[in-house]
Amino acid sequence: MKWIVIDTIIQPSCGISFSAIWGNMKMIIWYQSTIFLPPGSIFTPVKSGIILKDKEYPITIYNIAPFNKDLWSLLKSSQECPPGESKITNKCLHNSCIIKICPYGLK
């Protein structure tokens, strides 16, 4: 089954991400990975992780739940990344970010 990413939220201090996805229904996945799942990505879940663009990546999925608009709004409002002021300077202001390559292109 292929899943399509609608939106993704990253918490850089802990490396946890949340993605709104579409499979058989709209869902929210809570996961940890070394890769970023940008909106529009299409991936297939497998036992050891996911297959994205014909390559297998490890991913730890903590939970999958039906999409809830209120929960998604709460997650978006507490999003640490990317901070608005960083867009102006192109510099990340998070000293505790554990993500090696910024998916937003910040340095």
From Swiss-Prot:
Keyword Disulfide bond found: no
Principal location: cytoplasm
Keyword Phosphoprotein: no
Alphabetically ordered keywords of this record: Cytoplasm, Stress response
Highest taxon listed in the record's lineage: Bacteria
Subcellular location: Cytoplasm
GO CC terms, sorted: cytoplasm
Gene Ontology annotations of biological process type: cellular response to starvation
Function: Inhibits RpoS proteolysis by regulating RssB activity, thereby increasing the stability of the sigma stress factor RpoS during magnesium starvation.
NCBIfam families in alphabetical order: PRK09919.1
Annotated family: Belongs to the IraM/RssC family.
Protein name: Anti-adapter protein IraM
Organism: Escherichia coli (strain 55989 / EAEC)
Name of encoding gene: iraM
